[in-house]
């Protein structure tokens, strides 16, 4: 995530072996690997979304400029396109690939800052997804996933999933394809799954002691 110069605690520079996957440098090293990076992101998405992820394409540190020269641009840590397959068949031309942005963030952002940042990210991402003359219903789903070592909303939840909805009637279907998922590494409310708990613990403390399943074992080999 851009503007990462302020971390939760002011720390002296650490050696590479002291870094964890929430640290920007190590995370970028992981996602930048031509093959390992895609597999790492596939495992992350599989664990976070709790469903099968067949194949992904990853663009590390994707830069999206502002809409004008004096407007704010953004840098996405891991821009991911999921290739959606139907029952193991080839990718259908009419099926739009879902877009994911995974953002480990150790910067403590108070109040409105984090939600407004995500609003801005979504807006700029969308400007690059729809070619001229293309129908709006071809706009792909976009999910921004933020992984945090602090609780962004104070409810001690490991998972906060944010979607737009009708205020007056929650039963109204409003599928704009926009979703934010905030993951608090230490959250306990909401009965988070064991695999997600273990993965987030490993991301915060990426040591062999926290390797608890085959997926994390594979990620740990990439880290080493």
Q: Over which residues does each language-model region extend?
A:
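Elongated, amphipathic alpha-helical interaction scaffolds
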Residues: 1-224
């Amino acid at each position: 995530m851009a503007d990462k110069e302020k971390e939760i605690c002011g720390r002296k520079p650490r050696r590479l072996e002291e870094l964890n996957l929430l640290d920007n440098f190590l995370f970028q090293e992981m996602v930048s690997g031509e093959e390992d990076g895609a597999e790492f992101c596939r495992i992350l998405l599989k664990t976070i979304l709790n469903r099968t992820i067949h194949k992904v394409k990853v663009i590390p540190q994707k830069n999206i400029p502002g809409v004008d020269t004096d407007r704010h641009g953004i840098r996405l840590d891991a821009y991911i396109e999921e290739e959606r397959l139907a029952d193991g068949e080839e990718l259908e031309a009419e099926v739009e690939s879902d877009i994911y942005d995974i953002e480990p963030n150790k910067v403590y952002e108070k109040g409105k800052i984090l939600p407004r940042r995500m609003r801005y990210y979504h807006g700029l991402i969308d400007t690059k997804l729809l070619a001229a003359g293309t129908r709006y219903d071809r706009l792909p789903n976009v999910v921004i996933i933020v992984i945090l070592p602090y609780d962004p909303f104070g409810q001690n939840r490991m998972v906060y999933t944010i979607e737009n909805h009708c205020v007056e009637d929650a039963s109204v279907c409003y599928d704009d394809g926009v979703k934010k998922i905030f993951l608090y590494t230490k959250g306990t409310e909401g009965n988070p799954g064991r695999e997600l708990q273990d993965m987030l613990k490993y991301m915060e403390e990426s040591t062999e002691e926290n390797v608890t399943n085959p997926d994390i074992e594979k990620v740990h080999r990439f880290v080493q």
